[in-house]
Amino acid sequence: MRVPLRPFAVACLGLFAAALLASGCSNSERPAAGMEPRSSAPASHRVIAYGQPVPKGGGSYKVGDPYQIDGQWHTPREDPGYDRTGIASYYAHDFHGRRTANGEIFDMSALSAAHPTLPLPSLVYVTNMENGRTLLLRVNDRGPYVNNRVIDVSRAAARYLGFETRGTARVRVRYAGRAPLTGDDRQEQRFLASQSWFRVALSHAPYASR
């Protein structure tokens, strides 16, 4: 039986996760030119400045009408059996603090993603086919629209999945249901904590044994 994480454990998980994300970061706020993969999804007006806390939730449930980007039609729809394999990329600084397609605010440090057609917000399992790492991510934005990529993930997700440096990875994406409008991410955090690769990483954190 799976035992729910207590609030203190959730807080500790957040600290450990922050430490892991911080490891390997450059000293500059932005990555070196050319290092950050770009999405052709249009960016909205920035409403949260760099360094300021990004509120969770605040958006609405949205499926949307068919739309066209660069001559290609996309048809949003409920798709409970969605299970696709393809190339993932990530987006970060250029979109951080801006509104997503359903009215939330993109946080590059959150476990989130953008998808061309799945309902917003929804949950998906994303597995890196090269290293086997899997995350549960909140889909709250539209995109990507580059080279038939199947999903754009946040910078944090790309780092956890192990492809931040390279920029893209072959992944499997599976629909996991609707996400709460409140932005509650405890389900994603619990799934992360349950992964063996993540627990190994925690065991190597500088203060893991304290």
Task: State where each predicted segment sits.
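Bacterial N-terminal signal peptides that target proteins for export
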Residues: 1-13
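Secreted/periplasmic proteins
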Residues: 2-4, 25-210
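Bacterial Sec-type N-terminal signal peptides, specifically the leucine/valine-rich hydrophobic h-region
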Residues: 21-22
